Structure formats: structure tokens, C-alpha cells
């Protein structure tokens, strides 16, 4: 019989169960046996979320690939690109709704051509045409840039977005919440404090957000942990985060990645991915209930393993993911509801469909077993 004694100190475990993990505790857990960390995180997941694993039938809609930013990790932006018209956006949303989507995620670059008045028209038009769709849209960066372009404060922009029908703001553009890192990888983006102020203002305006962390580039381990602890501090104040989504950096077709690859460094390892999901569960226990294992970054099989390491959500069907694909993502752009159910049951968990705000949706696969038009059934919904 295997009887190896756990090496995690009892006081560290006690603090974890109470939601009082310290930075010193987190470092100790990451430096120790990873499987003990996974076991602890999995137990905390069971306490916080039970044995259900959620997913959302959604579609990404990329409004524009034009962007005046200079992010070194991005392979998506272009100075000569497209901006979708309102009619084109509504068409994409309509196709998604027919396929059973309950959410559309509207995002893109930031450009003077997309000011706050444009975004307000997009939100109002979508909500008028599809009132039952959850509108998960814009990042703190887009809100700041568009608000400034339109000559209004961030607070006013958020109030007007809420009034227009915005259900949830994306928590992207966080990258790593360290100004040292941001000056290297995204010098023209909002500062750490501006990101914090924007999501805090959104929460206070009644707009929930998710939170993200993009890791595996120039940040240190301490900066990763500081990021997650920052999310915890915001959540203590506002309670407005629905989930944390760890996203591994994709090092292809972008300047930051080119430098990494030239120096012999590659993207985060699978073990690092699982450790970050696990330590995020430990740090955020009692504060943020949902930790996502995003299949489009991790791949389906590692995402399934992550369900044993603290994750309780697999994200969305997506239907398209231009940003990951541009940076070398190779895991496809679509997973059908049927395949999500298969993955979750295969991990010994209970699948649950949800919406953006983690409200349960009665499942019932639309159309051809939930397959989005244009994807072959033989591929189980994965365009690879």
C-alpha cells in the first residue's frame, strides 16, 4: 500500500481551506510535490463547485483586426484590416443563436474608427435583435480607449454600456498585472492600476467581468502569483468576478515569441499550466468560485486533466478564435456541446451548460448534435 506522508505543512493546508493562503504559502506549494498541490486544489474545487463541470455555448465575434497598439505578443493586429458593419455583426450573432448559443463575446483591436458611440450602437443593436443572448463584450483596454476617443470618462462609458444592454465585460487585456512586464510586452496598453480601476468601476456599475492571466513569457513566478493575489483583493472589495481564466502565451508569429524561441525558451510546459490552475484555486478559494481550463490554449486532453487539478469549467464552444490561431494555436476553434459532455463525463464529472453569468441552462443540443454550421460531424466539432 502506498502510504507516503504528505509534505505540505499542516498550517499551510489549514490556511488554504480557510481561504487565507499567503504568498509564502503559494511559493511553498509550487516548489513542492505537484501532485500534492493538485490533490489540495481538487479538494478545494469539490468544496467550492461540487462535481459539476460547466461550459457555455457561445460564439466569438471579432469586430476588427485594426489596432493602433503595439503589443509584442499579438499576431492578430494589422493597420490595414477590416471593421465589421452592424449588419455583419448581427448576421454572425444570428448564426450563433441558430446553433444554440446563449452568449456572444464581442472583441477586437482598438482603433479610432471604433469609438464608444460605435460600441454602444453594436450593443444596442444586438440586444434589440437578440434580447435573450448574453452580451459579453469589450476589454478594459477597449473601454478606456473608446471612452477617451469619444471624450467621456470610463465611468460614464460603463454606465452607458450597461444601459445599452451589456451583460458582462471581458477581463482580457490584463496579461500580467505588473507594470514592469507591461512595459515590455504591451507598452501602449493601460497600466496595471488602470486595469484594476476599470474592472472595479464595472463591478460597481453592476457589470460583472471575468479575470484572465496570460503567462509564460517574460514574467517571473512572483509576478504570476502577485497577479492572482491582485484578483483576490479586487474580489474582496467588489465580488464582481465570475471566473479566472489562465491563458498560456502562444509564442508564434509575434515579436515576444520570436525572442523567446531564439533564446531556446518555449511556451509554458503542461506541468506549469496545471500548477497555475491549481495554485489559482488555492489562492482564490472562498472568493472566486470558478476556475476555467481553456481548451483552446491547453488542448482538450490537458484541459480534461486540469479538471483533476482545481478547474471546474471548460469555457465555450467559441466557433472561431482568430487571436489564438494567428499566434500558432493548434487546438481548433470549435468544440460542440456533445464533445464537451463527452469530455466531462470522461473525467468522472457531471456536465452543466451555463451562460456568461454562470446561470444553469437546460441542455438540449441544437440542430446536428450542437454542431456549428460548416464543421464536419466526423471531426467531433474540432476544426484542426
Curated annotation (Swiss-Prot):
It comes from the Archaea. It catalyses: 5-amino-6-(D-ribitylamino)uracil + L-tyrosine + S-adenosyl-L-methionine = 5-amino-5-(4-hydroxybenzyl)-6-(D-ribitylimino)-5,6-dihydrouracil + 2-iminoacetate + 5'-deoxyadenosine + L-methionine + H(+). Its cofactor is [4Fe-4S] cluster. Binds 1 [4Fe-4S] cluster. The cluster is coordinated with 3 cysteines and an exchangeable S-adenosyl-L-methionine. The keyword 4Fe-4S applies. GO terms for molecular function: 4 iron, 4 sulfur cluster binding; 5-amino-6-(D-ribitylamino)uracil--L-tyrosine 4-hydroxyphenyl transferase activity; 7,8-didemethyl-8-hydroxy-5-deazariboflavin synthase activity; iron ion binding. Keywords: 4Fe-4S, Iron, Iron-sulfur, Metal-binding, S-adenosyl-L-methionine, Transferase. [4Fe-4S] cluster binds at residues 67, 71, 74. Residues 53-286 form the Radical SAM core domain. Its EC number is 2.5.1.147. It holds the Pfam family Radical_SAM. Pathway: Cofactor biosynthesis; coenzyme F0 biosynthesis. InterPro entries: Aldolase_TIM, CofH/MnqC-like_C, CofH_family, Elp3/MiaA/NifB-like_rSAM, F420, FO_synthase_su2, rSAM. Consists of two subunits, CofG and CofH. Belongs to the radical SAM superfamily. CofH family. Catalyzes the radical-mediated synthesis of 5-amino-5-(4-hydroxybenzyl)-6-(D-ribitylimino)-5,6-dihydrouracil from 5-amino-6-(D-ribitylamino)uracil and L-tyrosine. NCBIfam families: CofH family radical SAM protein, F420_cofH, PRK07360.1. This is 5-amino-6-(D-ribitylamino)uracil--L-tyrosine 4-hydroxyphenyl transferase 2.
Amino acid at each position: 500500500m502506498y502510504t507516503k506522508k504528505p509534505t505540505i505543512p499542516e498550517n499551510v493546508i489549514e490556511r488554504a481551506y480557510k481561504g487565507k493562503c499567503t504568498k509564502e504559502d503559494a511559493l511553498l506549494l509550487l516548489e513542492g510535490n505537484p501532485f500534492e498541490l493538485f490533490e489540495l486544489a481538487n479538494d478545494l474545487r469539490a468544496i467550492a463547485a461540487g462535481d459539476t463541470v460547466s461550459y457555455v455555448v457561445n460564439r466569438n465575434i471579432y469586430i476588427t483586426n485594426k489596432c493602433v497598439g503595439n503589443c509584442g505578443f499579438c499576431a492578430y493586429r494589422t493597420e490595414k484590416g477590416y471593421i465589421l458593419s452592424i449588419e455583419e455583426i448581427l448576421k454572425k450573432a444570428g448564426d450563433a443563436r441558430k446553433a444554440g448559443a446563449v452568449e456572444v463575446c464581442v472583441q477586437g483591436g482598438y482603433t479610432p474608427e471604433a469609438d464608444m458611440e460605435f460600441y454602444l450602437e453594436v450593443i444596442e443593436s444586438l440586444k434589440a435583435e437578440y434580447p435573450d443572448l448574453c452580451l459579453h463584450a469589450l476589454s478594459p483596454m477597449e473601454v478606456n480607449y473608446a471612452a477617451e476617443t469619444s471624450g467621456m470618462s470610463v465611468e460614464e462609458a460603463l454606465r452607458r454600456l450597461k444601459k445599452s444592454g451589456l451583460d458582462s465585460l471581458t477581463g482580457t487585456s490584463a496579461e500580467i498585472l505588473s507594470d514592469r512586464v507591461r512595459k515590455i510586452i504591451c507598452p501602449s496598453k493601460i497600466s496595471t492600476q488602470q486595469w484594476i480601476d476599470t474592472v472595479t468601476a464595472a463591478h460597481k456599475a453592476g457589470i460583472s467581468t471575468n479575470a484572465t492571466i496570460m503567462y509564460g513569457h517574460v514574467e517571473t513566478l512572483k509576478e504570476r502569483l502577485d497577479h492572482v493575489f491582485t484578483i483576490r483583493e479586487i474580489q474582496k472589495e467588489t465580488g464582481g468576478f465570475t471566473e479566472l481564466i489562465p491563458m498560456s502565451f502562444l509564442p508564434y508569429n509575434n515579436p515576444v515569441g520570436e525572442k523567446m524561441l531564439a533564446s531556446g525558451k518555449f511556451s509554458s510546459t503542461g506541468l506549469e499550466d496545471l500548477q497555475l490552475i491549481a495554485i489559482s484555486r488555492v489562492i482564490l478559494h472562498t472568493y472566486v468560485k470558478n476556475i476555467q481550463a481553456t481548451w483552446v490554449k491547453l488542448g482538450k486532453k490537458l484541459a480534461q486533466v486540469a479538471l483533476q487539478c482545481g478547474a471546474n469549467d471548460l469555457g465555450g464552444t467559441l466557433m472561431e478564435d482568430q487571436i489564438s490561431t494567428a499566434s500558432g494555436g493548434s487546438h481548433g476553434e470549435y468544440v460542440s456541446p456533445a464533445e464537451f459532455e463527452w469530455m466531462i463525463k470522461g473525467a468522472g464529472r457531471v456536465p452543466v451548460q451555463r451562460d456568461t453569468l454562470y446561470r444553469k441552462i437546460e441542455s438540449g443540443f441544437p440542430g446536428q448534435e450542437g454542431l456549428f454550421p460548416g464543421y464536419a460531424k466526423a471531426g467531433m466539432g474540432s476544426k484542426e
